[in-house]
Amino acid sequence: MPRSPGTRLKPAKYIPVATAAALLVGSSTLFFVFTCPWLTRAVSPAVPVYNGIIFLFVLANFSMATFMDPGVFPRADEDEDKEDDFRAPLYKNVDVRGIQVRMKWCATCHFYRPPRCSHCSVCDNCVEDFDHHCPWVNNCIGRRNYRYFFLFLLSLSAHMVGVVAFGLVYVLNHAEGLGAAHTTITMAVMCVAGLFFIPVIGLTGFHVVLVTRGRTTNEQVTGKFRGGVNPFTRGCCGNVEHVLCSPLAPRYVVEPPRLPLAVSLKPPFLRPELLDRAAPLKVKLSDNGLKAGLGRSKSKGSLDRLDEKPLDLGPPLPPKIEAGTFSSDLQTPRPGSAESALSVQRTSPPTPAMYKFRPAFPTGPKVPFCGPGEQVPGPDSLTLGDDSIRSLDFVSEPSLDLPDYGPGGLHAAYPPSPPLSASDAFSGALRSLSLKASSRRGGDHVALQPLRSEGGPPTPHRSIFAPHALPNRNGSLSYDSLLNPGSPGGHACPAHPAVGMAGYHSPYLHPGATGDPPRPLPRSFSPVLGPRPREPSPVRYDNLSRTIMASIQERKDREERERLLRSQADSLFGDSGVYDAPSSYSLQQASVLSEGPRGPALRYGSRDDLVAGPGFGGARNPALQTSLSSLSSSVSRAPRTSSSSLQADQASSNAPGPRPSSGSHRSPARQGLPSPPGTPHLTILRGPQSCRLHPHGPPRATALADRAEDHPQLKTPPSKLNGQSPGLARLGLATGPPGPSASPTRHTLVKKVSGVGGTTYEISV
């Protein structure tokens, strides 16, 4: 009989079945050996043939009833019906042919037993159409083996009848010699067969009745359907036909195979067509999967197949450039390169997610602010202080397409930016910027080489220090960078041919757009007049999303309204070009004239406008704006006498080389006519390293007015000069009394002022 998994072997269970098998086989064998030969000679040869066929049929049905699955239902898992085990009712009723049949919950198998199913206490299994558990076959009798059990009873009964009948014939013919061996053995077999014939015949008759009624032994004993109608009966003939001729019911429990299956595994990540040509593979199998020690030798055929059908791999990584090669390229700059005038030491700001790479922007000698038409020697001719060397220079949106980068430049590894010290970051907010304290301290001031001014037609110019290139460590894509991108190809500054324009290059331009067409050199124009409107940005807006386009359009509309307000305010409040003290006019003008997003403008103004420009911390640097507010207050309180002018001129005369012209330190958008010597002038060097104020000659008011009349298109509302408001330019270009104030006989006093972000300002008094 098939054992359920986990059950122990019980020898007592096999005693009845072993006894039945021994009696059956032993008695039949003795009958065929001692009785059948005489019956064959005396009666007929058909007697042993008949008994032999019946005996084989008995053995076959006995074996099937013993070893066949009776129809055991599999048990439910422990977690499958855990909740139903506690909350399920004990019985459930179902309709079978219109009759209510009760199903009982099995606490052992964890399911409701189907109709006519019962749990065997010996086998500990629920059996379909359970009849009884027979100890003589050591198996439950159920739906799948009841047929063979019933046939076993019938055949055994017939075999026992034949053994007893033919044995009796033999004994009657040998009555004189009952003591003979053959007669004694025949009488013993007849006793055994006759002894078990009564119960077997009775059991066979009982099951014949059950089969004809369509019942099981369990239903008959428990009294089911005793007083009612059996819903499972099919009639007498139908029931007999169902038991003997119905197809075999399926098996619900399959025992796991005892022999391990040989599974052929193929190594992963190899194409099947390559395996036939490859050498044998050495594969290690472990409990957690496939651990390959794939020592496979590559054959020529497999390599050829790989060439014909390449694997789906990504593009190969470009070769890396050695550090020495990249450093040598930086040390020997090429003309027109964006990094030609920059030092070898590189610092790169954090790269946003949308950028594929970011060119380095090293620290080192910074180029002073100059006009578009001036020529300035290389960085070797500049002498910078320690503060300017330690400071860092970050550009808001660097150019992504440098003109002279190589294939390896795209993947060059840039070192991280060195962190800023706390003294450089917050020194502007912690120090006093009064001129009284600055007069007690001296500092090294930068001596600039003589600059040469060249004339040219007035044309808009994009400087390398445009408003969109303000120092910014975020490197984000701002609206100003979209509307005011730098030269895509890195235009060279006319004043510094070796330095490329470090403006933002739009990532939406196609690769072929390498630069803008060359423009004529602009000539000097009046500082009080604004430049022409800037040319439209080369940004391709068709690649932008609707949200960005809507924000850009809204920004443009707001700029148009601000431009109209500034033009009206400019017509109402005329600029006299004189140095004025803080008054209500200055405050009103600072509040009415809001700063524009771009378009530098240099105008005369009051002291309060000094701190309004974002380049000196206006809107982008509130801490520096506060520092410069105290600076402007100190400047307004300083006595405007000839002594300050003498000291300023002395500082200009003591500088190595001839004194630079007034236009050399102005914004390219606000270049004015050459001013005669002797007029105090404020020179502002815009950059994260230094900002110096030098007095020079006074501008001619009449010439500026004539210049404004000659070029009415240049007269624009006040804007920013390198990120600063018009008030700062007014402070620097305030007119003073000519004559004795231009005497270069006294020494200058220089004040170093540190701002937020590592910006250093040197103010010469």
Swiss-Prot record:
GO MF, one example: protein-cysteine S-palmitoyltransferase activity
Location (main, coarse): Golgi
Gene Ontology cellular component annotations, sorted alphabetically: Golgi apparatus; Golgi membrane; mitochondrial membrane
Gene name tied to this protein: ZDHHC8
Assigned keywords, A-Z: Acyltransferase, Golgi apparatus, Lipoprotein, Membrane, Methylation, Mitochondrion, Palmitate, Phosphoprotein, Transferase, Transmembrane, Transmembrane helix
Active-site feature positions: 134 (s-palmitoyl cysteine intermediate)
Lumenal side: 35-52, 170-190
Residue numbers of Omega-N-methylarginine PTMs: 441
Role played: Palmitoyltransferase that catalyzes the addition of palmitate onto various protein substrates and therefore functions in several unrelated biological processes. Through the palmitoylation of ABCA1 regulates the localization of the transporter to the plasma membrane and thereby regulates its function in cholesterol and phospholipid efflux. Could also pamitoylate the D(2) dopamine receptor DRD2 and regulate its stability and localization to the plasma membrane. Could also play a role in glutamatergic transmission.
Any Pfam family: DHHC
Transmembrane residue ranges: 14-34, 53-73, 149-169, 191-211
PROSITE patterns: DHHC
Location relative to the cell: Golgi apparatus membrane; Mitochondrion membrane
Catalytic activity, reaction form: L-cysteinyl-[protein] + hexadecanoyl-CoA = S-hexadecanoyl-L-cysteinyl-[protein] + CoA
Family note: Belongs to the DHHC palmitoyltransferase family. ERF2/ZDHHC9 subfamily.
Organism whose genome encodes this protein: Pan troglodytes
Ranges for domain DHHC: 104-154
Keyword Calcium among UniProt keywords: no
Protein name: Palmitoyltransferase ZDHHC8
Compositionally biased region (Low complexity): 622-653
Keyword Transferase among record annotations: yes
Domain notes: The DHHC domain is required for palmitoyltransferase activity.
Biased composition (Basic and acidic residues): 301-311
Residues on Cytoplasmic side: 1-13, 74-148, 212-765
Modified residues (Phosphoserine): 337, 606, 627, 675, 725, 743
EC code(s) of this entry: 2.3.1.225
